Amino acid sequence: MTRLSAAPFLSIACIAAIAAVTLPGCGKPEYCAKKTEFNSSVTTLTSVSLTPPDPTEINTDITNVQNAGTAMINAAQSDFPSQSTALENAVNDVVATGKTLTTSKDLTATGITLAAQLLTLNSAWNSFKTATNDACS
């Protein structure tokens, strides 16, 4: 390469290197970015409401947990297999119970089961957060 043709290449390479260093989240695993979305979906699902729960809303919230969880778990599976598997199992249990909820009467019948599963989900989520904290900070 001649001196004139190398200059634009080097300029582009320098800009790319600077951008890679200064962009937030660069160098962090993919699951780190996905933790925020999953946390938000779990918080929405487990938030206490003063109005009677609507099975349709609950199922929408469960679907959001499932979608965000699947993306995050798939990204973390190779680095944190036991925590990912525990979280995946907890999400799957909540999803399976959610599929049985079509009326408020269904919610009354399965409310205790769902509440216990949400506690398990929260525990698995806390373990996952603890395990991935160093990689994501």
Where do the protein language model's features map onto the residues?
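Sec-dependent bacterial lipoprotein signal peptides
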Residues: 1-24
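Long, amphipathic, charge-rich alpha-helical segments that form helical bundles/coiled-coils
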Residues: 61-125
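Immediate post-signal-peptide N-terminus of mature secreted/exported proteins
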Residues: 26-70
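Short, low-complexity, Pro/Ser/Thr/Gly-rich segments in the mature regions of secreted, periplasmic
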Residues: 124-137
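Extracellular secreted precursors and ectodomains with disulfide-bonded cysteine-rich loops/domains
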Residues: 24, 30, 132-134
